[in-house]
Regions:
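Generic N-terminal leader/targeting and pre-domain segments
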Residues: 1-160
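Intrinsically disordered, low-complexity regions
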Residues: 6, 25-29, 41, 236, ...
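Generic hydrophobic, helix-prone segments enriched in Leu/Val/Ile
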Residues: 48, 101-116, 220-222, 304-322, ...
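Sequence-level detector for tyrosine residue identity
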Residues: 68, 73, 112, 151-154, ...
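Short strand-loop-strand
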Residues: 299, 306-403, 412-435, 442-515
Length: 515
């Protein structure tokens, strides 16, 4: 028997919803003509939520679900425009749009799960498995949309989403439907392929994607997700690389086997060896000068970002980094400033402590440490009007109880949907940043650019001496370029040897000093 997380029906709802399909369709069509997609989505989501909590025949619920589905399919892209590429934490219209998008996807999922449970319980099905397969497919589509909306808004996935997704796939596998095509229009779409898409998207660490990267990864998976395989047979070694564990019966996403840990109950193993091989071949072709996909862009920056993204996917799907240090809880106070101009000014050493603001410098915003390792921090914004942040931002931070300024890079977000400050993770780049100025060799001295030098022994967790690095304004310099460095009262030359990272408004290079 298929058991899913469903709300109980209300025998006497305070405000009974309209359930006559022609009336509902006319009402929705009128709402879709209104100028505010956010308000339309909110109202439609509320109506669907009420509909999901009253009893009715299967045929009527299916007809209503399809009407709501087509409306939601129209609204989701419009809602994304309000929150997919903005700074965080979300507020105002962006926050309302994100809430409406996730709510609408969640209620759509409930509508089809009601139908799937009813259809799965039928003992005699004269029409064959066609309707059952279509309902499994719709449930998978709704799950994908819940995840996409959550990832785009950097918000937690709603409770029981993963629990039900695993249960639906296990049900399809048990009934022998997981490899059946849904219909002639989508001859290559099966429940297993849709499930693989959601699993691989979750394994890619989507809360660390830059704006626009989620869509690129989703398109990549539409073509390549079948290179990954699902099996009940455990790998030879439980810590094997390119293997993920799918915890059927638990409400959380797949996790890499090489990270250890164990779960009770049944498991499915996701093997990504062939997918990793495809990624490696594509990276070799790009390194040899091969073309990027047409939708990526032809400029050098877009190409570099795409190559960096593929390398990250290879790392996450094949050899994800295992945690080297335990997280240590803390409640220390922190002040931060985001962006290269502010970080450069604070790197000059003019900020005294967490408790004292410095006149003439950009304002710092208050945060609190949630936990930390030698490699970085998880922080929570604590101000009533928290500062705006973006994934990939470079930040200067000063932690209560520590001497000196640190420089870090924001790696992930977690929104609360409450309009308050968000949680975010940052990777420590240096304990001893040094403000300097640089200009290309033979360029006029008046074109000096603010740069931040990260000394060779720049991180406390490093096991060897990595090359010194330099943070420069985006587009100011390039690899293998010689630059003149002004550090305090001294001048010297350096050659930029490797582009390591790039983020909003800056690039991070390795460099070699030249005598």
């Amino acid at each position: 028997m298929l058991r899913l997380s469903l709300p109980t029906f209300e025998s006497r709802p305070a405000n009974p919803p309209e359930t006559r399909p022609p009336k509902v369709k006319a009402w929705i069509d009128e709402l879709l003509r209104q100028p505010s997609a956010v308000e339309a989505a909110r109202v439609i989501g509320d109506a669907l939520a009420a509909t999901n909590r009253v009893s009715m025949s299967n045929s009527r619920r299916l007809e209503l679900a399809e009407i709501y589905w087509h409306a939601a399919y129209t609204l989701w892209p419009l809602l994304e425009q309000h929150f997919a590429r903005v700074s965080h934490p979300l507020a105002g219209v962006a926050l309302d749009a994100a809430k409406a998008a996730v709510t609408l996807a969640t209620e759509m999922s409930l509508a089809y799960k009601h139908l799937l449970v009813r259809e799965a319980d039928r003992r005699l099905v004269l029409s064959g498995p066609r309707l059952l397969l279509a309902l499994v497919h719709r449930c998978m589509q709704c799950t994908t949309r819940i995840l996409v909306n959550s990832y785009l808004s950097y918000a937690p996935v709603p409770p029981r989403t993963w629990l039900d997704a695993h249960a639906i796939y296990a049900f399809a596998r048990e009934r022998g439907l997981h490899l059946n095509t849904v219909n002639a229009d989508t001859s290559d779409m099966t429940p297993e392929r849709a499930y693989l898409h959601t699993l691989l998207l979750a394994l890619a660490n989507p809360y660390g994607f830059l704006p626009g990267q989620l869509a690129i990864v989703a398109r990549y998976l539409l073509t390549h997700c079948t290179a990954a395989k699902l099996t009940d047979v455990p790998p030879v070694h439980r810590m094997a690389k390119a293997v993920a564990i799918v915890p059927v019966g638990h409400d959380f996403p797949p996790f890499s086997a090489n990270k250890g840990g164990s779960v009770e109950g049944s498991k499915i193993y996701l093997l990504t060896f062939d997918l990793a091989f495809k990624l490696q071949e594509e990276l070799r072709a790009l390194d040899a000068g091969g073309p990027v996909p047409p939708d990526i862009g032809s400029d050098a920056n877009a190409r570099a970002q795409y190559v960096t993204l593929l390398r990250r996917l290879l790392r996450q799907w094949a050899i994800p980094p295992a945690r080297q240090f335990n997280r240590l809880p803390s409640r220390a106070r922190v002040v931060i400033c985001a962006g290269l101009p502010g970080v450069w000014q604070y790197s000059r050493g003019e900020h005294e402590s967490v408790h004292k603001s410095s006149s003439g410098l950009p304002a710092m915003s208050a945060c609190q440490v949630v936990n930390h390792t030698p490699a970085g921090y998880a922080l929570r914004q604590t101000e009533g009007q928290p500062g705006a942040l973006r994934i990939g931002d470079i930040i200067a931070l000063r932690v209560e109880g520590r001497t000196g300024l640190q420089v870090a890079m924001i790696r992930w977000f977690r929104n609360t949907f409450k309009g308050a400050g968000l949680e975010f993770g940052c990777e420590l780049l240096s304990d001893a940043p040094e403000a300097a100025a640089a200009v290309a060799e033979n360029a006029p001295s008046g074109t000096l650019a603010p740069v931040i030098i990260l000394p060779e022994d720049r991180a406390p967790h490093a096991t060897d001496h990595a090359p010194p690095q330099i943070i420069v304004p985006a587009g100011a310099f390039q690899v293998e370029q010689a630059v003149s460095l002004r550090r305090g009262g001294h001048s010297g030359f350096a050659v930029l040897t490797k582009l390591v990272e790039h983020g909003p408004g800056f690039e991070l290079y390795e460099f070699v000093p030249v005598a």
